[in-house]
Regions:
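Active-site beta->alpha loop and helix N-cap motifs at the rims of alpha/beta catalytic domains
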Residues: 1-8, 13-143, 149
Length: 150
């Protein structure tokens, strides 16, 4: 898979009752696509994924797929602190028809490079769609080394 163009890590808008506001999300998706964005990344840090329950995350992925799946390349942010959860979210996104995944370093645990390799390898073995490694050392406390990428 070759990534070309602009991919937007989209926010997850909430209403006053802390539910995902899908009307606002539709307008956001329409706006970014009308302005040249070719791909959407729901479920990333910008999307406040840490504030979503598992069912909300799955509902978000399904909504974005149903609403924009024919208009944009979709990359699901499937980050979590536990590899088994990343695998479950990744398999669900792949089954929904997402084009790729974005997987960050597990937060808070500060894994070493051997542990990172084991984490990413387990996810890659569990799904058959491309994975973009999200290297955000300031947030994760660990940087993905070139050895892990190789």
């Amino acid at each position: 898979m070759k990534l070309r163009g602009v991919y937007a890590p989209i926010v997850t808008p909430f209403d006053a009752n802390e539910n995902i506001n899908y009307d606002v999300l539709k307008r956001l998706i329409d706006h970014v696509l009308a302005n040249g964005v070719v791909g959407l990344v729901p479920g990333g840090t910008t999307g406040e994924v840490y504030a979503l329950s598992e069912s909300e995350r799955m509902d978000l992925f399904k909504f974005v797929k149903d609403y924009a799946g024919t208009k944009a390349v979709l990359i699901a942010g499937t980050n979590s602190g536990a590899t088994r959860d990343v695998i479950r979210y990744s398999q669900a996104a792949a089954k929904m028809g997402y084009d790729a995944l974005m997987v960050a370093v597990p937060p808070y645990s500060r894994p070493n490079q051997r542990e990172l390799l084991a984490h990413y390898s387990a996810v890659a073995e569990a799904v058959k769609i491309p994975i973009a490694l999200y290297n955000f050392p300031w947030r994760a406390g660990t940087e993905v080394s070139y050895e892990v990428l190789d």
